């Protein structure tokens, strides 16, 4: 067995053993650089996942602005994946990506719903990512 083959097999085994995660991106876009916030959130989420051995199986985007997560097509896809048992972790940049601070009860409801299905919510933004657990209310 060559060294390259051994390395490929090791990577494949690590991917099989890692926890499946969905990266959820819902950010307000700047008028001057509309894709910058989205790219930053996605890059940060992928870095977060890689550093923790999580396997991002899908990236889901929603436009920012709708406070009720259940009215967002992307968030409903997150719920669908959680219900099916396809993911163990939802990665978001910060809590307001799920629901804005003024609607925190909606965020807490969604986090509880995910937790009941064995799914963790993890924040990729550096000041919040230091904790091993997401927000639990």
Model segments located where?
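Short, structured surface patches at the beginning of a domain
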Residues: 1-137
């Amino acid at each position: 067995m060559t060294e390259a083959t051994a390395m490929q097999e090791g990577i494949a085994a690590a991917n099989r053993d890692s926890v499946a995660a969905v990266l959820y991106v819902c950010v307000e876009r700047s008028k001057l650089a509309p894709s910058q916030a989205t790219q930053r959130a996605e890059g940060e989420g992928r870095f977060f996942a890689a550093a923790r051995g999580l396997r991002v199986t899908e990236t889901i985007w929603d436009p920012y602005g709708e406070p009720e997560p259940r009215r967002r097509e992307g968030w409903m896809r997150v719920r669908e994946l959680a219900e099916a048992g396809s993911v163990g972790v939802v990665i978001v940049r910060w809590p307001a990506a799920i629901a804005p601070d003024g609607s925190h009860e909606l965020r807490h409801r969604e986090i509880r719903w995910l937790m009941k299905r064995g799914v963790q919510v993890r924040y990729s933004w550096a000041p919040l990512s230091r904790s091993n657990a997401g927000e639990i209310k």
